[in-house]
């Protein structure tokens, strides 16, 4: 069995897909935010690796093929935006202000947290790209001297939390405007948040897709500036 895992180029991909399918089944059955498919799949994969003492390198021989699809999948998010382009043109100033303020708030929150908890410089820059998609965040972290593997974990946690609590936050804050919901999810919770935005509606999904791209670009620029503040 272990020899098959070590020599298989598809074991990692297979176990990842099965784990995600389990997450989807649980979400449909219980309809609760805690049963997020991505969160469930992460727990399942980690559990399998620990129980059967499978080395991460062996798992990643197949798992990396799913990672390769991350960038093209992000690019495909332009499709819903194109379908709602008329809304973007009509609300351009509000959209730009929303994404800019959301990105700035995210960077400021990390700076405040770093000072509050006494992070060193490497820990600080590792956290800076927390709200942007993994494909961009890994590059930002590496460029600034952060720990890329931890950056990836932080990005995933941020996205999952955003996905889980978005509807609760919107309900408490009485936010009902679809454009605002989409921008909030895309700016703060990247692609994972966008998955939730698409569940909420086509306008939310389109605005969230736009927010991912613009917030990513702003964070690349802003992170370089904020990195020098600690």
Q: How would you name each of these model-derived features?
A:
Residues 2-16, 20-82, 87-98, 102:
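Helical membrane-embedded segments and adjacent short helical loop/helix-boundary regions
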Residues 12-25, 42, 46, 50, ...:
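Transmembrane alpha-helical segments of multi-pass membrane transport proteins and ion-pumping complexes
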Residues 27-31, 53, 146, 170-175, ...:
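Generic secondary-structure signature for well-ordered alpha-helical cores
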Residues 30-34, 55-56, 60, 86-87, ...:
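Membrane-interfacial segments
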Residues 40, 98, 154, 210-211:
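Hydrophobic core positions of alpha-helical segments in small-molecule transporters
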Residues 57, 106, 122, 163, ...:
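Short, electropositive, low-hydrophobicity segments enriched in small/polar residues
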Residues 81-160:
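Internal active-site segments that recognize and position negatively charged phosphoryl groups
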Residues 123-150, 156-158, 172, 176-214:
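Alpha-helical membrane segments and immediately flanking helix-loop junctions
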């Amino acid at each position: 069995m272990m020899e098959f895992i070590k020599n298989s180029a598809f074991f990692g991909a297979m176990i990842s897909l099965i784990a995600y399918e389990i997450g989807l089944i649980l979400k449909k059955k219980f309809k609760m935010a805690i049963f997020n498919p991505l969160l469930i799949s992460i727990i399942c994969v980690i559990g399998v690796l620990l129980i059967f003492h499978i080395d991460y390198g062996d798992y990643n021989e197949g798992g990396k093929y799913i990672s390769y699809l991350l960038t093209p999948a992000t690019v495909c998010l332009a499709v819903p935006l194109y379908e709602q382009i008329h809304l973007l043109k009509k609300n351009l100033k509000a959209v730009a202000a929303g994404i800019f303020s959301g990105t700035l708030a995210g960077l400021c929150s990390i700076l405040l947290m770093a000072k509050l908890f006494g992070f060193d410089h490497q820990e600080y820059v590792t956290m800076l790209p927390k709200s942007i998609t993994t494909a961009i965040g890994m590059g930002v972290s590496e460029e600034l001297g952060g720990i890329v593997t931890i950056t990836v974990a932080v990005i995933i946690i941020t996205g999952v939390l955003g996905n889980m609590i978005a509807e609760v936050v919107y309900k408490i804050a009485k936010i009902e405007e679809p454009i605002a919901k989409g921008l909030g999810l895309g700016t703060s919770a990247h692609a994972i948040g966008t998955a939730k935005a698409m569940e909420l509606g086509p306008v939310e999904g389109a605005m969230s897709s736009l927010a991912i791209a613009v917030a990513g670009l702003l964070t690349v620029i802003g992170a370089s500036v904020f990195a020098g503040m600690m």
